[in-house]
């Protein structure tokens, strides 16, 4: 690989460029019409203007692929956010002979859909949270709520969700309809899909994620864990690696479960498999998988002394 187009902006674009340059790879930046003075452009070897302004310019697959072909980029790194988990973007890159730095299209299709990800976990005998596990109507949601023991709480999630958007905690059945309406609207705006599913809301659990890495040929490994329980509005605020709350037994069980899920799809690149852990009841449940580089990857880099972005590029 001699040239890499970085399909992002800001901090993550700069982070990727640093690792690419360390590997002797030419870096190519992109920018929207209103990002002409953005800092990330000064860190690239070359830059190309995208048509349009704002966020929409960085979500235009056709335009970005066109630029990649024009500048003869050999690979594309999507960073995080924007098109990083879009299977269509991965497909178009590979179709045009450009390496996609990330998981394959088929993997993104599974992990980008929270229901499909839960189905995979169940298939691999990894426990999941009790829920509807399918696109759910208001009537089905009401039926599910009634099936739980008295005093239970429900959480609404977007099927295509991420980043805490499209999520609502419902403490009473009478609040269900209004919460569904709000969550559906938010999911539609954020992900282009209003589809929702429902789970029992588990309180007083630790949120633990296992960092995984795979080469796409059936070899996968783990890069230990991160504790991300401290959150506000479902957004992670503080991450600690390794988790100070995990017992050795639980750590081994979570790692084994994460690797089984990754092996099932011949995982390629970096990703995280996330769990809720209740150490009082000695149980854990799979929540979701993120098939991309995460903002908090630097926390893991600090404890291992590895450059995870370099690893991504080398695998690609």
Regions found by a protein language model. Give the residues of each.
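ATP-binding N-terminal substructure of ATP-dependent carboxylate-amine bond-forming enzymes
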Residues: 1-124, 136-143
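Alpha-helix N-cap recognition
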Residues: 137, 171-172
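Conserved beta3 strand of the protein kinase N-lobe
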Residues: 131-132
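Acidic/histidine-enriched active-site and ligand-binding environments that engage anionic O-linkages
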Residues: 145-156
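ATP-dependent carboxylate activation and anion-phosphoryl transfer catalytic cores
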Residues: 2-27, 47-49, 69-71, 102, ...
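Short, flexible turn/loop "capping" segments at secondary-structure junctions
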Residues: 41, 158-161, 235
């Amino acid at each position: 690989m001699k040239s890499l187009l970085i399909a992002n902006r800001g901090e993550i674009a700069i982070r990727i460029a640093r690792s690419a340059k360390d590997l002797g790879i030419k870096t190519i930046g992109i920018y929207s019409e209103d990002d002409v003075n953005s800092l990330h452009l000064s860190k690239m070897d070359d830059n190309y203007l995208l048509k349009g302004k704002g966020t929409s310019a960085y979500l235009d697959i056709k335009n970005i692929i066109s630029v990649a072909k024009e500048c003869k980029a050999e690979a594309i790194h999507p960073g995080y956010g924007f098109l990083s988990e879009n299977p269509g973007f991965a497909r178009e890159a590979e179709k045009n002979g450009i390496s996609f730095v990330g998981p394959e299209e088929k993997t993104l299709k599974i992990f980008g859909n929270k229901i499909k990800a839960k189905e995979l976990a169940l298939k691999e005998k990894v426990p999941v949270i009790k829920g509807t596990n399918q696109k759910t109507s208001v009537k089905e949601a009401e039926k599910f709520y009634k099936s739980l023991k008295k005093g239970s709480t429900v959480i609404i999630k977007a099927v295509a969700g991420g980043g805490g958007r499209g999520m609502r905690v419902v403490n009473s059945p009478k609040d269900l309809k209004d919460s569904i309406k709000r969550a559906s609207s938010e999911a539609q705006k954020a992900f282009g899909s209003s589809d929702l599913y429902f789970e029992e809301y588990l309180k007083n659990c630790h949120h633990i994620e296992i960092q995984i890495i795979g080469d796409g040929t059936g070899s996968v490994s783990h890069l230990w864990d991160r504790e991300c329980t401290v959150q506000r509005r479902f957004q992670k605020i503080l991450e600690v690696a390794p988790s100070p709350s995990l017992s050795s037994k639980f750590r081994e069980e979570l790692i084994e479960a994460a690797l089984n899920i990754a092996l099932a799809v011949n995982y390629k690149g970096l990703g995280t498999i996330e769990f809720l852990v209740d150490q009082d009841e000695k149980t854990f449940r799979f929540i979701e998988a993120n098939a991309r580089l995460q903002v908090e990857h630097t926390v893991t880099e600090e404890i291992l002394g590895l450059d995870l972005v370099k690893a991504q590029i080398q695998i690609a």
